[in-house]
């Protein structure tokens, strides 16, 4: 589930999340693969310090271009499940 193949490249979604956490102002992140649209979507909870375009530029410092998310969704608070982990199931429903 954490590893995908996109345009001939193997991509670990966890690596994208780790890189996103290095961008200043990032609180929580979750990278998901939207199989229907064949794109990586990055859900980001930030302090609102960076506009999306600049956030993407910062992210490029930490990961190669082929790993960059095609879409970024900023949220005030990412949903959490009963175990206080990011609720990936709820986020996947937002992709539909």
Regions found by a protein language model. Name each.
Residues 1-96:
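AMP-dependent adenylate-forming
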